[in-house]
């Protein structure tokens, strides 16, 4: 990938840089994890223009990237995908403390296995998030079906499998709260 978000911010937006996923759903990939000071300065203006053009903007960021702080600053709210293990639990709590619970829309546990340890951290998340207003849906189970759908460019809504009902409901909870807040 030679051109994406970085190119659009630095050299001008161009519809050809976007990948159309579905009707009214576009993806602007990040072609590099290296962002210059110039990118950071121009990013706010770029996002403000996108806010006018789009109803919703989702930034899928790698939490270890330095630019992640910039993405967090310009976001209205964050959806944090996480796992049920000690280090990820602690890291998630650190993000909540750093940005404030009011900046966090949802915390979604992914690749959940019904093990003693994961159940323990799920309960810890529940306890920690109680009364914060953060949306905390049922965890997304680790399923090979989901992995296969992703590999084939499909979503969990494009399968009739009953195994996906919990995952669909979890995402529906998050989406409905986003729409509800916007209305």
Where are these regions (language model features)?
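P-loop NTP-binding core
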Residues: 1-183
